[in-house]
Amino acid sequence: MIGAILAGGFGKRLKPLTDEIPKAMIQIKENYTILDRQIFDFRNLGIKDVIILSGYLGEKIEERYGKEMNGIKFTYLKEDKPLGTLESMRNLIKERSDSDVLLRNGDTVTDMNFKKFVEFSSGSPYDMTMFVTRMKSPFGIVDLLGDQIMSFREKPNLNHFINAGVYYIKKEALRYFSMEYFSKDIETTVFPKVAAERKAGAYFEDTLWLGIDSEKDLEQIRKEYVNRTDFPWGFKKRVFSSGERIMDDFYVRSEQSLSVEVTGPSVVRITGGRGKIFSSEEKMYSENDVMSVTSNFSLSPLENTRFTVMSF
């Protein structure tokens, strides 16, 4: 399996930030770009070869990563003028057609469990699998019963799914990209073709996902990354610190494990997920559980787990 990133967009709605760098090179925290995060995900999967499908200011990407970094070999396929994502994929196939491809749009950040995504996709009967996420309403929702207002919901998730910009494409499916189409983007050509042949699958996971397409999106992801550090198992974020009082927020992906050090009496609050916790004794945990601990503990999540630790 190889990794590939579609990073050729102009990022017009993010000007002037994209006047001198491509959108994928925008920082989501100090010295940590969108592309850094995506490559971090690839590295944690053990991917050794990554192809960057670039265009506008693509040389800036090559300057940052070079031919090899942190055990990953980079290949750059740069278009001098934008020809669409279909042509970008055709260029990739000319370079490599011997492996399955984990393809990403270069403007998304997600905490999805890539290991589970790859396991699901590679073992499925589908030629291509797409990560999907729930569509969020851009407006607040008013629930009515006749002419009576029953409740308000502020920008809830809707019962619709959208393309989240992460795709597992088996090498057998690469033939679809060589067919003749009347459009130049894979979303309006290859994907509908594969779906029509019932060879397209979907993978859903309820986790952070954000497409960074506007200043508002960028503000949201930068807020998320305040005091946050990513790890192969998830992330840790310092929420509060005053004297000896410290609160940390943790996110651990399912089928991972994490040992947590505490310096004294602490309270663990599970805000999502379920699994096993090992402290003075082994027991199951689930959402909304609150536990007191006085020594180091570890978790083995059965589901993606979010929890806070308040130390006194």
Predicted regions and their residues:
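Conserved N-terminal catalytic core of the sugar/cofactor nucleotidyltransferase
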Residues: I2-I5, Q27-N105, F114-K116, Y176-E180
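Short acidic-glycine-tyrosine-enriched beta hairpin
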Residues: K276-F297
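Glycine- and acidic-residue-biased ligand/ion/polar-headgroup-sensing regions
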Residues: T263-S280
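A short glycine-rich, His/Asp/Glu-containing loop-to-beta-strand
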Residues: W233-G264
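A short hydrophobic beta-strand segment most commonly corresponding to one strand
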Residues: S298-F312
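A short, conserved acidic/glycine-rich loop-to-beta-strand motif
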Residues: S124-R134
